[in-house]
From Swiss-Prot:
One of its GO terms (molecular function) is magnesium ion binding. Transmembrane segments: none annotated. This is Translation initiation factor eIF2 assembly protein. It comes from the Eukaryota. It comes from Candida albicans (strain SC5314 / ATCC MYA-2876) (Yeast). GO terms for biological process: eukaryotic translation initiation factor 2 complex assembly. The keyword Nucleotide-binding applies. ATP-dependent protein-folding chaperone for the eIF2 complex. Binds to the gamma subunit of the eIF2 complex which allows the subunit to assemble with the alpha and beta subunits. GO terms for cellular component: cytoplasm. Belongs to the CDC123 family. It is found in: Cytoplasm. Keywords: ATP-binding, Chaperone, Cytoplasm, Magnesium, Metal-binding, Nucleotide-binding. Mg(2+) binds at D268, N270. The keyword Nucleotide-binding applies.
Amino acid sequence: MTERDYTTFETIDLTSEEVLQCSYSNWSKLFPGKTFPSKIIKPLPSTFLDYLASESIRLPSNTNNKKITVLEADSDNEYSDWDDEEDQQQDAEHNDNVFSQFQDIQDKIDASIQEMGGAVFTKLNWSSPKDAKWIMPGNTIKCQNVSDVYLLLNSSDHIGDDLDNPFSEVQKKKTIPEKVDYELVLTKWQEINPAYEFRVFVKDHRIIGISQRDNNKYEFLQGLKSELNEKITQFVEDHVIPKLKSDTQLSKYIVDVYVSKNDIYIIDINPFSRKSDSCLFTWVELLDKKDKHDNHHELRLVENQNFAKEFSESQVPIEVVGATMDTEAMVELAREWDKLQAKEK
């Protein structure tokens, strides 16, 4: 094997400060009118963060569910449920006690949802729970009440990573802060066309690539490719790059944008790291663009239909999805799981 056969794994010098500057509240305030209306709830108490990080899914008892069902993983990663009335009553009391510890957060979520028209989508500092939309009726991240918000946040691996490993890609571990000021972001729900969502990669204050975000093929985009490239490039070069260059220390980052009929909106700004999806590029391709004077970049669109489901690594069999919509079905699913585990022992 010759030297040409090897691909050098190039590290990305990501700093903890870059990660923090990509926290929603830090960058969104720089772009008034260029983001969708949002409410930021912070600081978040440790009791609320512990609730999000727990291995059980608990929802407030003042929902429409007449019966509270709580599934918890034990040390063997097996699941059990409570059948008798006494256990259910005890669990209901514990459930109420858990939520009473951050009732003010729940009240703020309720108020924010109402203020923004009755529907929002949610995220923490960096990630949204898109990977957990399978658990919601209608396969959506649209939240219309507190329980929707809690269910998505509790079920998301992306949110878990925000809580447990926000600085995992930072090389200089000694610079990592001991404490993170977490925030809950509630953004007014928008009916958007996923075909017009794009991811822009910026390095050394210049665009090095633009990619379609949705993994479906849209024939009509091919005819708009040149126009979209021009519009997105102009927006990022005129608004995003100059502002982040003057007001932050960011020189590399990833910008998610939505191209509407009359404007372009910033959906998110992410750290420039392999933890972020490189979409239709490879990280080798992106990191190979080292000439700071080369302003040429490519916009890539999906050319072949992709039948793989997005976030499939975070999804579960259809029986589980059905169970999430029916508490009795969820209990029955837990019983069947225990029976299967017992047979294997």
